[in-house]
Amino acid sequence: MPIIDVQVHPFDRNHPGRPWASPSHGLDSATGEEMVAAMNSVGVDGAIMVSSFSAYEYDPSYALEVYNTYPDKFRVVTPVDATDPAIDDVVAKWAARQGARGIRIRMRNGLPMDADHPGLNRAFAAAAKHGLPVNLLCWGILDKGLPHIQIGRAHV
């Protein structure tokens, strides 16, 4: 049975060609090459990359670059802005991309924290329409109004 890491965050070093949106609180990089070497060293067959919001915000281009280099190792989840009025189109375009496997919604730091926010409902509906799972970052507010959503809570 293949061993899959379900959440890794790829990012290149901070440089003018690919500047970070905010500083890293740890590694200088977690490139595709570094990830593949680490995965191979411990017998991990593949991974789901969640594009690094702290490095690139809503731009998944680095994760897609890694996917294009190692399509046999990775699939990609991208952060989406649930407040974007065009969220339906954003999710539809993402779903059509080679390697796309899900979306990530962040409910923190100035973004919708209310489970009843209409953008969240639109994002969930768009993901469901296109068969994409949702990776939900919602520290401290997980159960406040989304009883109909099946949520995996483990993060190890």
Feature annotation, model-predicted:
Residues 154-156:
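Conserved small/polar residues in nucleotide/adenosyl-binding loops
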Residues 54-142, 147:
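Active-site gating/metal-coordination segments in enzymes
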